[in-house]
């Protein structure tokens, strides 16, 4: 294990085969050229120069102000504003952070990833990088850092987000049902304080686009035939098993993952579509009506609703299957589409 030098000591390793520690004793080397630590690691330019650091990724509430010194002007820097709280959205930044580290290492730069204390936010980012580059499950990557630094302990929210990252194949796929459900849950945590709902939360109204993806299914109001949503908006879930299926508000990665629609589910749970926006603002729950004929299609509840299979979905935008018809969209003559 590494020993941080005392006030009058030089750089020493208690084990010559162990990873190096900087002379400042404020950063640990995870692998050649990759360090993590706290705010003290960037307090003095000399600390960075001694360790050969030429790229710094900061994950903190404030961006550090680097003192002038040799090499500071040439530093690669990336700042990700983030509090060390379970509700902080770190997942949406992971691809950018992992790419920054990867590019810096590819160009021969040594990288420091730091937060304030060097135990949670920076640990989460380094864990994501190890997961991606070494194709490691969350637990194995996290364990590597805890061996290096036993006090390393990311909050439970970051743990959950990294498990979602793993479930998405080590990349943030914004089109996946997992990410869409995650994004909805993050909005729910702030609702109803939000004055406006983020526009990226809503799927495009299918009446505003003429074509869909290959093999997509279009769902129409059974009464008036108005197009309502596409199959890509359906958020699949695993079958529930009684009260335990909705004992926890937050869905786990395993409950978000499924290989197909559940036949026993009598409703589709979908992401919000643009035509729903006026009905959702300022209220916690209500009915979902067809925007054309006002036929009742289903309901929504930001606190969640139980599916007929037993799974609790939060938040819930539920369309009853017996209120809509499926229309398969198939490509015809290249750019045209046909419906069957």
From Swiss-Prot:
The active site is at residue 115. This is Dual specificity protein phosphatase 12. Ubiquitous, highest expression in spleen, testis, ovary, and peripheral blood leukocytes and lower expression in liver and lung. Substrate binds at residues 116-121. Its main location: nucleus. GO terms for molecular function: kinase binding; phosphatase activity; protein serine/threonine phosphatase activity; protein tyrosine phosphatase activity; protein tyrosine/serine/threonine phosphatase activity; zinc ion binding. It is found in: Nucleus; Cytoplasm, Cytosol. PANTHER family: DUAL SPECIFICITY PROTEIN PHOSPHATASE 12 (PTHR45848:SF4), DUAL SPECIFICITY PROTEIN PHOSPHATASE 12 FAMILY MEMBER (PTHR45848). One of its GO terms (cellular component) is cytosol. It comes from Homo sapiens (Human). InterPro entries: Dual-sp_phosphatase_cat-dom, DUSP12, Prot-tyrosine_phosphatase-like, Tyr_Pase_dom, TYR_PHOSPHATASE_DUAL_dom, Znf_C2H2_type.
């Amino acid at each position: 294990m590494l020993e941080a030098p005392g006030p009058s000591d030089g750089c020493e390793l208690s084990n010559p085969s162990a990873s190096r520690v900087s002379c400042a004793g404020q950063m640990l080397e995870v692998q050649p050229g990759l360090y993590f630590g706290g705010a003290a690691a960037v307090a003095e330019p000399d600390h960075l120069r001694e360790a050969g650091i030429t790229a710094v990724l900061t994950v903190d509430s404030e961006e550090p102000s680097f003192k002038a010194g040799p090499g500071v002007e040439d530093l690669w820097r990336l700042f990700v504003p983030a509090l060390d709280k379970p509700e902080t959205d770190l997942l949406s930044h992971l691809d950018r952070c992992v790419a920054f580290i990867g590019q810096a290492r590819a160009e021969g730069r040594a990288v420091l990833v730091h937060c304030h204390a060097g135990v949670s936010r920076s640990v989460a980012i380094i864990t994501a990088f190890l997961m991606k580059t070494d194709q490691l499950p969350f637990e194995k990557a996290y364990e590597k850092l805890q061996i290096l630094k036993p006090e390393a302990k990311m909050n439970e929210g970051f743990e959950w987000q990294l498990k979602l990252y793993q479930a998405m194949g080590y990349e943030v796929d914004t089109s996946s049902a997992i990410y869409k459900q995650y994004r909805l849950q993050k909005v729910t945590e702030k609702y109803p304080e939000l004055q406006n709902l983020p526009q990226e939360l809503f799927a495009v109204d299918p009446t505003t686009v003429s074509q869909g993806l290959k093999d997509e299914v279009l769902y129409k109001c059974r009464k008036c035939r108005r197009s309502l949503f596409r199959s890509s908006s359906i958020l699949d879930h695993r079958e529930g098993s009684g009260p335990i299926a909705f004992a926890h508000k937050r869905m786990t990665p395993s409950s978000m993952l499924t290989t197909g629609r559940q036949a026993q589910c009598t409703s589709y749970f979908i992401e919000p579509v643009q035509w729903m926006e006026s009905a959702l603002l300022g209220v916690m729950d209500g009915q979902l009506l067809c925007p054309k004929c006002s036929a009742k299609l289903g309901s929504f509840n930001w606190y969640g609703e139980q599916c007929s299979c037993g799974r609790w979905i939060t938040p819930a935008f539920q369309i009853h299957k017996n209120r809509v018809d499926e229309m398969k969209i198939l490509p015809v003559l290249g750019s045209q589409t046909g419906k069957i």
